[in-house]
């Protein structure tokens, strides 16, 4: 690492930081997508439930009885919100991926340029 110029060392540190950010974004996106799938499954299951059936919903740490209509509205709102977050995270992921690839390329170029033996003068 001592042979590597300080500028490249800084770029390597930035690259590691970007990689961590990218992993965080991908992880969050995966969690949101899982929650969306679960909510959609709940909506599908509620389609078979009679309108006047007792439906329960978690509100914080308490389970409360709500109308089917209220639960469906809540689930659909949650799905919509999470889908917006996923789209935002996808944009963030794409931007980070682009910057990551660009910085990787710069670092490779700097290291390859440094490692090349001096040519004939």
From Swiss-Prot:
Keywords from the UniProt entry: Chaperone, Cytoplasm
A Pfam family: Prefoldin_2
Keyword Coiled coil attached: no
GO CC annotation terms, alphabetical: cytoplasm; prefoldin complex
Main location: cytoplasm
InterPro entries assigned: PFD_beta-like, PfdB, Prefoldin
PANTHER family (UniProt xref): PREFOLDIN SUBUNIT 1, PREFOLDIN SUBUNIT 1-RELATED
Subunit description: Heterohexamer of two alpha and four beta subunits.
Protein name: Prefoldin subunit beta
Natural source organism: Methanoculleus marisnigri (strain ATCC 35101 / DSM 1498 / JR1)
């Amino acid at each position: 690492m001592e042979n590597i110029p300080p500028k490249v060392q800084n770029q390597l540190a930035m690259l590691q930081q970007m990689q961590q950010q990218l992993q965080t974004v991908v992880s969050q996106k995966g969690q949101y997508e899982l929650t969306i799938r679960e909510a959609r499954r709940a909506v599908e299951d509620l389609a078979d439930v009679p309108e006047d059936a007792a439906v329960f919903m978690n509100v914080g740490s308490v389970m409360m009885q709500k109308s089917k209509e209220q639960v469906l509205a809540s689930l659909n709102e949650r799905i919509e919100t999470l889908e917006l977050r996923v789209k935002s995270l996808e944009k963030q992921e794409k931007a980070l991926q682009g910057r990551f690839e660009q910085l990787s390329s710069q670092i490779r170029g700097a290291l390859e340029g440094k490692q090349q033996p001096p040519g004939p003068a």
